[in-house]
Amino acid sequence: AEEIWEYASRTLTQSAASVAATVAGSTITAIRGDTLSAALENIGALTNYSKLWFTVKADEADTDATAQVQIELAGGLLYINGAAATTAANGSITINDESTGDVTILLKAPETAKLSPGSYYYDIQIQSSTGILVSTLTSGMFVVAADVTRATS
């Protein structure tokens, strides 16, 4: 069997847009109108929790109901661009490793298309299974880059 690097040709199996929607340090960058799939690793153990949220806001003092994005582990996409989401399945949080706290945030293209280019704040919070303790596991900047092509059909 040949080693992969010995093949006559190789095919990129991930789009450049998927690669661009990345996490660098504590900054998540998404391209407006593209599906965001961002892997965050080692954010802290995800055990004994009842809720987990990923929230993006223009100002940290904004209410959750006016968030640019809010996704809840069990509930999916709750808010988009300051309004209640109409399709909860367009956003999700997947726990990849509970012990280290590896998660993947997914926000589908129809939802990122609703976001204005700019810099925002994000965090991931967890509520303990007792319902009392809420902790911020990680936070940083969420950048929405403008898309060049706006055609959808």
Predicted regions and their residues:
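Fibrous stalk/shaft segments of extracellular and virion attachment machinery
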Residues: 1-20
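Contiguous segments within soluble domain cores/interaction surfaces
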Residues: 15-153
